[in-house]
């Protein structure tokens, strides 16, 4: 398994890993067939509150679960991007855009928190640097690059589709929506959108169901927020 990670906080990343052989440096490449990062000793058990924990720890939980998901679904080439990188160091991601056809799966962390655990003031739908909007822009460029590589004339196809979790099951269970989904090459599942009474309605079985409806290996991207970490990968 191949994993490439882009992150903004090298020092915290290194401190969060328990073994010298597990240090992650941005950007990094690890072949998990020869050496697998062991995150099993992280002493966090589905915390109900994250206000006093370093957000980098949660990045490792996301990465661990992302790897498990990809292993279950035979996705072997993975990219993981800290959303802050997209906002602050966007140029560093140019090679991932260039090589987007190489990835089976791209995960994006959603971190609307400052280091003291408070919601960032910049986390606003009206803010041009909104992490979610920046993530969509990045994925749109990935999709644009895919179309270029395929020399496709299907420019009218939207480069990404975004669904709130509370609509996800409905979409999967209606044929007309499934037909529409097949026109997309990239799916983003947002499970942290405000206003949803139950942002955890979808499960790993729903994701598997969606994947099975495709024949052309779409990229499926998750904005994996703090609220769902104990449930998204159950």
Annotate each PLM feature.
Residues 12-21, 92-94, 163-166:
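Well-ordered, non-membrane alpha-helical segments in soluble/globular domains
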Residues 133-234:
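Catalytic core and acceptor-binding pocket of nucleotide-sugar-dependent glycosyltransferases
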Residues 1-61, 68-76, 137, 206-207, ...:
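N-terminal anchoring/stem segment of glycosyltransferases
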Residues 113-130, 153-160:
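A recurrent flexible, glycine/aromatic-enriched loop bordering the glycosyltransferase active site
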Residues 24-31, 77-82, 105-108, 179-183, ...:
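A structural signal for short, well-ordered beta-strand segments and their strand-loop junctions
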Residues 54, 58-115, 125, 132-133, ...:
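GT-A fold catalytic core of metal-dependent nucleotide-sugar glycosyltransferases
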Residues 91-92, 117-118, 142-146:
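A short secondary-structure junction signal
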Residues 13-14, 86-89, 95, 114-117, ...:
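Short catalytic/ligand-binding loop motif for oxyanion handling, primarily in non-cytosolic enzymes
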């Amino acid at each position: 398994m191949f994993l490439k990670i882009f992150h903004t906080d090298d020092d915290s990343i290194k401190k969060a890993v328990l073994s010298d052989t597990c240090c992650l440096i941005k950007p990094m490449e690890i072949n998990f067939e020869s050496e697998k990062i062991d995150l099993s000793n992280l002493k966090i058990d589905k915390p109900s509150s994250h206000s006093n924990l370093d957000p980098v720890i949660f990045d490792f939980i996301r990465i661990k679960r992302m790897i498990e998901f990809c292993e279950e679904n035979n996705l072997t080439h993975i990219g993981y991007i800290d959303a802050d990188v997209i906002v602050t160091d966007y140029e560093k991601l140019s090679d991932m855009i260039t090589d987007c056809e190489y990835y089976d799966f791209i995960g994006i962390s959603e971190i609307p928190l400052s280091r003291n655990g408070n919601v960032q003031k910049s986390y606003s739908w009206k803010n041009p640097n909104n992490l979610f909007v920046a993530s969509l822009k990045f994925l749109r460029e990935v999709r644009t690059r895919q179309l270029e590589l395929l020399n496709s004339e299907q420019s009218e196809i939207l480069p990404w589709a975004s669904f709130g979790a509370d609509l996800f099951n409905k979409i999967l269970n209606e044929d007309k929506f499934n037909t529409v989904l097949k026109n997309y090459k990239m799916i983003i599942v947002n499970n942290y959108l405000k206003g949803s009474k139950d942002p955890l309605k979808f499960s790993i079985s729903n994701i598997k169901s969606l994947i099975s409806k495709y024949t052309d290996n779409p990229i499926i991207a998750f904005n994996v927020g703090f609220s769902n970490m104990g449930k998204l990968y159950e």
